[in-house]
């Protein structure tokens, strides 16, 4: 099944609008959690070639699914008494229901940018960013004996006592 081509800006706009309406009734921790992840989404829009930006946005969306379940289950009974409370809670629930679909779309964008699902032991290892620079820890003969070139040029070589 082919996923529809949805712009990341549309995903951000929908979740921003639903989060804003959800903030009418839920605590500030709901707002901080969701708006922080939306800021990561803005970073992913600004840097179109960054795998880390879209990966962090994807991970944040997954995390907010669990956080929103906790927020809604704890505070729903106390806030859904009036019309405004039911509206805000409904928008937060709608945002929660759309997040798994958004995660699928963002994961598809992550794969298009060259990312892969980090299910390896070196998950917290080096970044997957592609650049023209060589790594410092590349193996070469100069790394094995750093003072070999100094002896050949007649320069003073530091000696251990």
UniProtKB/Swiss-Prot annotation:
Domain of life: Eukaryota
GO biological process, one term: regulation of blood pressure
UniProt-listed InterPro entries: AGTRAP
Main location: endoplasmic reticulum
Cytoplasmic side, ranges: 48-53, 108-161
Compartments where located: Endoplasmic reticulum membrane; Golgi apparatus membrane; Cytoplasmic vesicle membrane
Residues carrying Phosphoserine: 127, 138
UniProt KW keywords: Cytoplasmic vesicle, Endoplasmic reticulum, Golgi apparatus, Membrane, Phosphoprotein, Transmembrane, Transmembrane helix
GO cellular component terms given for this protein: cell cortex; cytoplasmic vesicle membrane; endoplasmic reticulum membrane; Golgi membrane; plasma membrane
Topology Extracellular: residue spans: 1-26, 75-86
Chain residue ranges for the region called Interaction with AGTR1: 110-122
TM annotation in the entry: 27-47, 54-74, 87-107
Membrane topology: Multi-pass membrane protein
Residues that bear Phosphothreonine: 135
Tissue localization of expression: Ubiquitous but more abundant in kidney, testis and heart.
GO MF, one example: angiotensin type II receptor activity
Pfam families reported for this sequence: AGTRAP
Subunit structure: Interacts with RACK1, and with the C-terminal region of AGTR1.
Protein purpose: Appears to be a negative regulator of type-1 angiotensin II receptor-mediated signaling by regulating receptor internalization as well as mechanism of receptor desensitization such as phosphorylation. Also induces a decrease in angiotensin II-stimulated transcriptional activity. May play a role of negative regulator in cardiomyocyte hypertrophy induced by angiotensin II through an inhibition of p38 mitogen-activated protein kinase pathway.
UniProt-recorded name of the protein: Type-1 angiotensin II receptor-associated protein
Organism this protein belongs to: Mus musculus
């Amino acid at each position: 099944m082919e996923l529809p081509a949805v712009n990341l800006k549309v995903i951000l706009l929908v979740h921003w609008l639903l989060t804003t309406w959800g903030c009418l009734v839920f605590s500030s921790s709901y707002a901080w959690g969701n708006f922080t992840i939306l800021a990561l989404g803005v970073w992913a829009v600004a840097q179109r070639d960054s795998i880390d930006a879209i990966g962090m946005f994807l991970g944040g969306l997954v995390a907010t699914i669990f956080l929103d379940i906790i927020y809604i289950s704890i505070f729903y009974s106390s806030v859904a008494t009036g019309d405004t409370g039911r509206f805000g809670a409904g928008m937060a629930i709608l945002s929660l229901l759309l997040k798994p679909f958004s995660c699928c779309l963002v994961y598809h964008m992550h794969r298009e940018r060259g990312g892969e699902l980090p299910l390896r032991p070196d998950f917290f290892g080096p970044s997957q960013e592609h650049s023209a620079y060589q790594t410092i820890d590349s193996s070469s003969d100069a790394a094995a004996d750093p003072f070999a070139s100094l002896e050949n040029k007649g320069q003073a070589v530091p000696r251990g006592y």
